[in-house]
Curated annotation (Swiss-Prot):
It holds the Pfam family Ribosomal_S8. Residues 1-28 are annotated as: Disordered. Belongs to the universal ribosomal protein uS8 family. Part of the 30S ribosomal subunit. Contacts proteins S5 and S12. One of the primary rRNA binding proteins, it binds directly to 16S rRNA central domain where it helps coordinate assembly of the platform of the 30S subunit. This is Small ribosomal subunit protein uS8. The keyword rRNA-binding applies. It comes from Prochlorococcus marinus (strain NATL2A).
Amino acid sequence: MANHDPISDMLTRIRNASEKRHEKTKVPASRMSLSIAKVLQSEGFIAEINEEGEGFRKQLILGLKYTGKHRSPIIRSMQRVSKPGLRIYKNTRGLPKVLGGLGIAIISTSNGVMSDRDARKQGVGGEVLCYVC
């Protein structure tokens, strides 16, 4: 069965794995999923990114982060914003602040995929892919 929204699939896999307290999760690799994973890693939501396999069977192995004695997940929620059927674009001034700056919005811009903070610093807008907090 074909996956029509690989970004939603990636977010769902990460969300499910973190709720079940898994150490790692596998995600089908693509340039977009790698870019999103790098943003999540730079913002401190995931620990590591490794690649496995070759060609169309290539997968990303994402190491998830937890905090405290009871291993509560760092990622509390992930929400897809722009979907294949309804794209959401924002200019620099319209970029959202997630939980008053505690979370991030991942934005696809002409300069690449980045967090909302980086997009504001660079003065670019783009497609709002998802919210993470």
